[in-house]
Structure formats: C-alpha cells, structure tokens
Amino acid sequence: MTPFTQHTGLVAPLDRANVDTDQIIPKQFLKSIKRTGFGPNLFDEWRYLDIGEPGRDNSTRPLNPEFVLNFPRYQGASVLLARENFGCGSSREHAPWALDEYGFRTVIAPSFADIFYNNSFKNGLLPIVLAEAQVDALFEQCLATEGYQLTVDLAAQRVRRPDGVEYGFDIDAFRKHCLLNGLDDIGLTLQDADAIGRFEQGHRARQPWLFGALQ
C-alpha cells in the first residue's frame, strides 16, 4: 500500500449527498476479486450516457457532459470533495478500490457511512471528516476557482487551502500510523513474519504428526 504523508492535489467537487456504494461502483462490476480494473467504471452510471458492462472498452462510450468528473477543469483530480453520508449503502470494498484506481488519494466530506469509512483506511484512501461549514467553504472556493488545490498533511492532521487557512481533522492513531507507513492488513502481518516463522517451527516440532498428514 502506498504511504500517505502529505498530498497536494486538484479538487473535484461532487455536490451530492448520500452517495451510495452502488453509485460509486455499480453492482455489475463486482464479479472480479482483483483490486484493479475498477477505476474506469467509477461513478459509471453518472459518467456515461449508456449502460456499462464488465470488459467493455470505455474509450468508445459516450460521456455525460454534465457530470463533474467529465469537466475538463477537473481532469487529474486527486482530492474528492463530497457531501454528507458519503459511501452509504451496501458493503463493497470495490468502492475505495475504484476511487483509488481513478486517482483519488483522499475524500473530504461532513460524514461517511461507517463501513465505507473503515474500508477506505484499509485500502490507502484517506477519508477526512470536516465540519459542514468548512466543507461549504471549500465547495464555494472550488467552484469559483479553476485549478483549485488543497494540501492534506496527515502527520499534522491539517487540510490547507490555497489562501493559507487550515482545518484540523481527527483520525485514530493506529489508522494514522498505518497510512503514514503504507501498511494494510497484510503489511501489518508481515511485520511479525519472524515471530510467525518461529511459531510454525515450534508447532511442527511439537506436533509433527499433524504436518506429516499434509505431505
């Protein structure tokens, strides 16, 4: 998992509340258990004018000119600005996978659905909760300023606007540690690889009959 320390990126404003996981990545794309291949179908039903199908070449599909991520000014955005209850609906880890593969490093909103919030941390996507008035101010500036960027400093737990105004945000210490060091569940486990190896050797010595049956 890519470490998250400090990130400055172009902001895309998704001015919709209660965006659910089926809108983030529609159900027909969930057949794959791989973590890749979902970015092109992020917000599929909003980005395109037709119905998407797995394996289809998206480069030939008609884009919805009214959807924010299709606006030329937001191409290359890596910070998603959203409204309350982002990521509600069914539990699907594919949602943060799709956001991450599209290029988003962080999502800023007044609130998130609990399961999506937890899944995001496990997949290197930083969900930031700010006060609604602060999010309103960011939307106002973003919509008024082409090329609007924000800087997110995870170590300091601050979001910095171009005018120097900063907003603090809360994050669990363990989740912060994992993001700063690029540790997902597998990475955390591998930190104890030596101890696990010693346990397996001892277990094999104590109960060799168990391992003999597997040979």
From Swiss-Prot:
The protein here is known as 3-isopropylmalate dehydratase small subunit
Listed under GO biological process in this entry are:
L-leucine biosynthetic process
Signal peptide extent? none
Query: Which CDD domains did the record assign?
Result: IPMI_Swivel
Q: What does this protein do?
A: Catalyzes the isomerization between 2-isopropylmalate and 3-isopropylmalate, via the formation of 2-isopropylmaleate.
On assembly, the entry states: Heterodimer of LeuC and LeuD.
EC number(s) per entry: 4.2.1.33
| Molecular function terms from GO | 3-isopropylmalate dehydratase activity
Q: Which reaction does it catalyse?
A: (2R,3S)-3-isopropylmalate = (2S)-2-isopropylmalate
Superkingdom of the organism of origin: Bacteria
Answer yes or no on keyword Amino-acid biosynthesis: yes
Keyword annotations: Amino-acid biosynthesis, Branched-chain amino acid biosynthesis, Leucine biosynthesis, Lyase
Query: Which Pfam families does the record cross-reference, listed alphabetically?
Result: Aconitase_C
